[in-house]
């Protein structure tokens, strides 16, 4: 086997447009594709994360789980970590504050937020600096 890198991560969400808006407008990920089901309804939105990988947001009909806290101990995907430049950290933090998006955790390398459905998102410059 020869894994060549990260291809994509898919997250199931109920409010597809709202969640896609967070990743597009707040985090600046460019939208690259939209897919519709046989019924014509929007099924998924793909966003470019750079390096050839993408984030696929997939519509589901169930509501998101309540906020379990930063570390909930459940199996499964813990978070989506996106790389930022260390030099951009203060600007990104100010933009999150301006938009009213609270940090749920912070380390010297990473800021953690939640998307509109509660998925953990890490904005990290580790090991840069």
Predicted regions and their residues:
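Short glycine-enriched loop/turn motifs at secondary-structure junctions
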Residues: 2-5, 73-77
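Histidine-centered active-site/metal-ligand motif
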Residues: 7-8, 44, 55, 79
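Core segments of cupin and vicinal oxygen chelate
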Residues: 12-54
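Vicinal oxygen chelate
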Residues: 16-17, 74-120, 127-128
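A short, acidic/glycine-rich surface segment
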Residues: 33, 42, 62-68
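Residue-level structural signal for beta-strand termini and adjacent loop
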Residues: 37, 60, 124-126
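Short, charged/polar surface micro-motifs in flexible loops or helix N-caps
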Residues: 50-55, 61-64, 87-89
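Short glycine-/small-residue motifs
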Residues: 54-57, 120-123
């Amino acid at each position: 086997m020869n894994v060549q890198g990260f291809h994509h991560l898919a997250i199931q969400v109920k409010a597809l447009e709202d969640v896609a808006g967070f990743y597009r407008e707040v985090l600046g990920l460019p939208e690259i594709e939209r897919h519709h089901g046989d019924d014509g309804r929007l099924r998924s939105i793909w966003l470019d994360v750079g390096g050839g990988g993408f984030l696929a947001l997939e519509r589901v009909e169930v509501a998101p789980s309540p906020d379990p806290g930063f570390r909930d101990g459940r199996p499964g995907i813990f978070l989506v970590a996106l790389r930022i430049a260390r030099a951009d950290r203060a600007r990104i933090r100010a933009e999150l504050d301006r938009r009213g998006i609270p940090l749920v955790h912070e380390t010297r390398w990473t800021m953690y937020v939640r998307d509109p459905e509660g998925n953990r998102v890490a904005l990290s410059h580790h090991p840069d600096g």
